[in-house]
Amino acid sequence: MKVAVYGKGGIGKSTTSCNISIALARRGRKVLQIGCDPKHDSTFTLTGFLIPTIIDTLQVKDYHYEDVWPEDVIYRGYGGVDCVEAGGPPAGAGCGGYVVGETVKLLKELNAFYEYDIILFDVLGDVVCGGFAAPLNYADYCIIITDNGFDALFAANRIAASVREKSHTHPLRLAGLVGNRTSGRDLIDKYVEACPMPVLEVLPLVEDIRVSRVKGKTLFEMAEYQPNLNYVCDFYLNIADQILSEPEGVVPREIPDRELFSLLSDFYLNSTFTNESDGGYDHQDVPLDFTII
């Protein structure tokens, strides 16, 4: 099974991906996580360092695939999860989709692409071109990471459109949304009411999730000496269980941009004014999740 993880830049895709990979490994699966970002830091919390990228390795080998060995590009991370970083083209040049294609090509040459029970693609930021959507060409499922804010859901809607487009060529399905580090889910619920799709899990607003990224450790590793984090790990295990159940998923029908803007902004503003009329808080107390320009 192959799973592609998408979401707005900075939403916590890599942190979430690493913890899901560990959860899948805890369920007895052989897992490979492929980072698809020029920053090549997707697997940092699994390995504890920035591993060499496939593109860097191919350049050193002058693109002679026969000179590349699995140990040159595949690194064993925490919990037995294998890690690969695709890397990317130089800034302002080249195509991210080409890099993903070269990564898959090399893994096939090494007879590694089909050796895993689960391959998880952790993909950079928002989908802005066909190149960044390239991992969807190989995926059975897409998972979108979001929060309870306007911008993340706007990006999720764009990604849903890419899933629908790619589903025309192969049996790709959207497994669902994962809300990351949020204390509420009212906007998420409003969005999925208008654009039906599963919500796999909503992760709590726990500072240790963010801190784990800085420490270069997954929540599972931190929980070994901080048992109070075990309950957070259960959220990721629940996501893993849903993935392993091979859910039916959906082919989403995205909402037109202007309609989505009106839907979420009106809902947000109306709920704000309702709370104000009830004496809950005034304008200065409203926690803004987005800015209208």
Curated annotation (Swiss-Prot):
Homodimer. Protochlorophyllide reductase is composed of three subunits; ChlL, ChlN and ChlB. Binds 1 [4Fe-4S] cluster per dimer. It is an enzyme of class 1 (oxidoreductase). Component of the dark-operative protochlorophyllide reductase (DPOR) that uses Mg-ATP and reduced ferredoxin to reduce ring D of protochlorophyllide (Pchlide) to form chlorophyllide a (Chlide). This reaction is light-independent. The L component serves as a unique electron donor to the NB-component of the complex, and binds Mg-ATP. Its main location: plastid. [4Fe-4S] cluster binds at residues 95, 129. One of its GO terms (molecular function) is ATP binding. Its cofactor is [4Fe-4S] cluster. NCBIfam families: DPOR_bchL. Keywords: 4Fe-4S, ATP-binding, Chlorophyll biosynthesis, Chloroplast, Iron, Iron-sulfur, Magnesium, Metal-binding, Nucleotide-binding, Oxidoreductase, Photosynthesis, Plastid. It holds the Pfam family Fer4_NifH. The keyword Repressor does not apply. ATP binds at residues 10-15, 39, 180-181. This is Light-independent protochlorophyllide reductase iron-sulfur ATP-binding protein. It catalyses: chlorophyllide a + oxidized 2[4Fe-4S]-[ferredoxin] + 2 ADP + 2 phosphate = protochlorophyllide a + reduced 2[4Fe-4S]-[ferredoxin] + 2 ATP + 2 H2O. PROSITE patterns: NIFH_FRXC_1, NIFH_FRXC_2, NIFH_FRXC_3. It is found in: Plastid, Chloroplast. It comes from Adiantum capillus-veneris (Maidenhair fern). Its EC number is 1.3.7.7. One of its GO terms (biological process) is light-independent chlorophyll biosynthetic process.
